[in-house]
Amino acid sequence: MATKLSIIVFSIVVLHLLLSAHMHFLINVCAECETKSAIPPLLECGPRCGDRCSNTQYKKPCLFFCNKCCNKCLCVPPGTYGNKQVCPCYNNWKTKSGGPKCP
């Protein structure tokens, strides 16, 4: 009986330590998220996508997909072309055929 009780107590202590470590990790990740300047509030998607799509001849589709990507990824790369490494989600979101989803 004592071994069952000690196993239960040990399991609870280990679970508590794991939860504490996980919460500490989440707090650190959230602190890093707040310091990134590439993440715009949702209201900034329009102007940032306007800048991103300013040099294309296909403005409507560019703005549509840029806003869609911005709303999902909360990030728009700077400039009118390239720089996608700044926003990994924006860069890694692909179409069914494997092409880039975001302009």
Curated annotation (Swiss-Prot):
Main location: secreted
Entry annotated with the keyword Secreted: yes
Encoding gene, per UniProt annotation: GASA13
Organism field: Arabidopsis thaliana
Record's function text: Gibberellin-regulated protein that may function in hormonal controlled steps of development such as seed germination, flowering and seed maturation.
Protein name: Gibberellin-regulated protein 13
Keywords annotated in UniProt: Disulfide bond, Gibberellin signaling pathway, Secreted, Signal
One Pfam assignment: GASA
InterPro entries according to UniProt: GASA (IPR003854)
Compartments (UniProt record): Secreted
Endpoints of the signal sequence: 1-20
Post-translational modification: Six disulfide bonds may be present.
